[in-house]
Swiss-Prot record:
UniProt cross-references to Gene3D superfamilies, sorted A to Z: Hexapeptide repeat proteins (2.160.10.10), MurE/MurF, N-terminal domain (3.40.1390.10)
Family: Belongs to the transferase hexapeptide repeat family. LpxD subfamily.
PANTHER family reported in the protein's UniProt record: UDP-3-O-ACYLGLUCOSAMINE N-ACYLTRANSFERASE, UDP-3-O-ACYLGLUCOSAMINE N-ACYLTRANSFERASE 1, MITOCHONDRIAL-RELATED
Subunit text: Homotrimer.
The enzyme's E.C. designation: 2.3.1.191
Record-given protein name: UDP-3-O-acylglucosamine N-acyltransferase
Recorded GO MF terms: N-acyltransferase activity
A GO cellular component entry from the record: membrane
Keyword Transferase: yes
Record pathway: Bacterial outer membrane biogenesis; LPS lipid A biosynthesis
Encoding gene, per UniProt annotation: lpxD
Length: 353
């Protein structure tokens, strides 16, 4: 693929796409800006990396309209676009190809119940188990060792990697990706305390509903609802090692980073950003576009859209940063207080004399 071809390709998404340099060089694939060499395409989206424009060995670099090219590396061509980061994502998609997860068709060792309805061009890998009354849409690929219990519905164009477990009654939309080790639809953590200190298990009779275009990372757990449904709305992206408890609702296009723990019946709005290791108490609500810093402890609802929160317990970032600054000044305040106490003591001694 030549640079001129990449310019035309990006022209589907951006207008204008400006070429600086030659368009005849062959591009064989993408590379990091600091490691790229002849034949590679890379990008610079952040001003902190502008220095690499003069240093890179890449044949092509995707940059913003305002990127300085006066000291550009000789032999490097540039494509200027409004959003170089997104442009490079499209280039990665073009070069990435498709992983082989399972061969087309049903593997000989797969176990598929007689009542299952399979769409066209479905791929079921070795030792896949599909329970009674499941429905799998066209073009879905299910990797080796994955288990779908009874009554699971999976939409079209989904990719389920090896060793995923999907419990009964789960409903999954189209173009969903689920990575290895994830469990969807296990029982919620519901137990009724008794007077003698023991617990009675609360039957978890609900389901999980996952919308279109959701991606779920490896070793993540999404519990079924006690009644009703735990819902992951369209376009949400969930990292590895995330726990989402029963009856939660995760808004569309919300992003949740690794090791976040979300207790039961939490409602998170649309387009929220949840940092790694953030922890949520139960029955809370976050408004749309809330940003939660890593390691935040959320113990109450935040209903103002677009708020940034951090700390333990979490509070608006502006308040928490002010308090952090005050805490950092405690040592100096202590020294001043001790000096004042010493002066006061000396004054008292003088007056007493």
């Amino acid at each position: 693929m030549k640079i001129a071809d990449i310019k035309a390709f990006l022209g589907r998404y951006f207008d204008p796409v400006e070429l600086v340099g030659t368009g005849d060089i062959e591009i064989v694939g993408p590379a990091k800006i600091e490691e790229a060499s002849t034949g590679h395409v890379s990008f610079v989206a952040n001003e902190k990396y502008y220095r690499y424009i003069a240093q890179t060995g890449a044949s092509l670099v995707i940059v913003s309209q305002k990127a300085p090219l006066d000291d550009a590396s000789p032999g490097t061509s540039f494509l200027k676009v409004a959003d170089p980061y997104t442009a490079f994502v499209f280039i990665l998609q073009h070069f990435s190809g498709k992983r082989r997860i399972a061969d087309t068709g049903i593997a000989a060792s797969a176990s598929v119940a007689a009542s299952v309805r399979l769409g066209e061009n479905v791929s079921l890998g070795e030792h896949v188990v599909i329970g009674e009354n499941c429905v799998i849409g066209d073009g879905t690929v299910i990797g080796p060792g994955t288990v779908l219990m009874d009554g699971v519905t999976v939409g079209s164009g989904c990719t389920i990697f090896p060793l995923v477990t999907i419990y009964d009654g789960t409903v999954i939309g189209d173009r969903v990706t689920i990575h290895s080790g994830t469990v969807v639809g296990a029982d919620g953590f519901g137990f009724a305390p008794q007077k003698d200190g023991s617990y009675i298990k609360i039957p978890q009779m609900g389901t999980v509903e996952i919308g279109d275009d959701v991606e779920i990372g490896a070793n993540t757990t999404i519990d079924r609802a006690t009644m009703g449904a735990t819902v992951i709305e369209k376009g949400a992206k969930i990292d590895n090692l995330v726990q989402i408890a029963h009856n939660c609702r995760i808004g569309g296009d919300t992003v949740i980073a690794s090791q976040a723990g979300i207790s039961g019946s939490v409602k998170i709005g649309r387009q929220c950003l949840i940092g790694g290791q953030a922890g949520f108490a139960g029955h809370l609500e976050l408004a749309d576009r809330t940003s939660v810093a890593a390691k935040a402890g959320i113990s109450k609802s935040f209903l103002e859209p677009g708020l940034a929160i951090r700390g333990v317990p979490a509070q608006p970032m502006r308040d928490q940063l002010r308090q952090e600054a005050q805490v950092r000044g405690l040592g100096e305040m202590k020294s001043k207080l001790e000096a004042l106490e010493a002066k006061l003591l000396a004054l008292q001694q003088q007056l007493g004399e």
